[in-house]
Amino acid sequence: MIIQKYLHNLKAWNALPVERQETIIGRKKPSDIEQRPFDKASYAHNVLTNIEEGGQQLHILRDNMPFGEVGKGEFGTYFIGYARSPDRIEKMLNNMFIGNPPGNYDRILDFSTAVTGGLFFVPGVVSGRCGSAGREGVNFRKL
């Protein structure tokens, strides 16, 4: 499991045209619909964070929680990600910060700065599934 705190330069981000923001993220802003694969920039956030091996996507369960302290003018997100292997998370971070290929980094990092974080071992569940009664839940065997 990885946890990271990112601070965002919202003034600089909001100064960008919407089309540029969409190119950086790889999604349409008003609808949040993912752009078609051939329309995405190679440095789009959702391209570089998609990890594949042998043509198969390697799953990472991800979530972001926005936060803000108006008095400090500090705004950002806490990111948390779970994966079967830390190799998946390391590959995602390498793609984002170094680039794939090197130099083709995630342009969202021009506006977001990781200020803290950690990588933790979390033991698996016995059944391989986690969820409430009556619902399938998340299949952690894929992660």
Residue ranges of model-derived segments:
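Long, histidine/aromatic-enriched segments associated with O2/redox biology
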Residues: 1-143
